Amino acid sequence: MITAWRIAKARYRDDAFSGNGGLQNAGRWHLQGQRVVYGASSLALAALEVFVHLNRAHAGIRWVMFEIGIPDEVPIEALAKAQLPRTWRHNPPTGSTMRLDSEWLRSGRAAVLRVPSAIIPAESNIPINPQQTDFGKLKLGRPQAFEFDSRLWK
């Protein structure tokens, strides 16, 4: 079993695996209007992936973390850096990376995708398709309180 992690606002704990956030906002790996759940290969990377979008005004938000167990029988599709467009790390994200994952979401080939992190390319983000049939096989942990260390808020 492979483990992935997700961090979400505590007020969305019951909705953290619906993919509803993707309906309202685009992300590096999807177009707005698509259900997707973002996870990461480590808890530290999950924290960084959230924290890069925050500033001091967000210091009072309550967060939760989820452990995600991906059983061996659940296929994981992977995109290697060599398969990505030259602009894949640009900020803001370009449409080229959004289209790659959007095609994967539409295809329904796998519930789990592994892509390099734009923050730390040697590590992986784990987009999850909550509408794919294997999604129900994932072991979604209970929400646990998560707190960003106060030294991070500069």
What spans do the regions from the language model cover?
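Short helix-loop boundary/capping segments at the starts of domains
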Residues: 52-60
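Extended catalytic/binding region for NAD+/ADP-ribose chemistry, centered on the ART fold
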Residues: 29-53, 127-131
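Active-site and NAD+-binding cores of ADP-ribose-processing enzymes
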Residues: 2-18, 31, 59-154
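A sequence-level detector of short, solvent-exposed, charge-rich linear segments
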Residues: 26, 48, 65-69
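Short, flexible, solvent-exposed loop/turn segments with mixed acidic/basic and small polar residues
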Residues: 24-29, 57
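Short amphipathic alpha-helical segments, especially helix-boundary/capping motifs
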Residues: 1, 20-26
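Glycine-rich, charged/polar anion/phosphate-binding loops
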Residues: 22-23, 52-53, 98
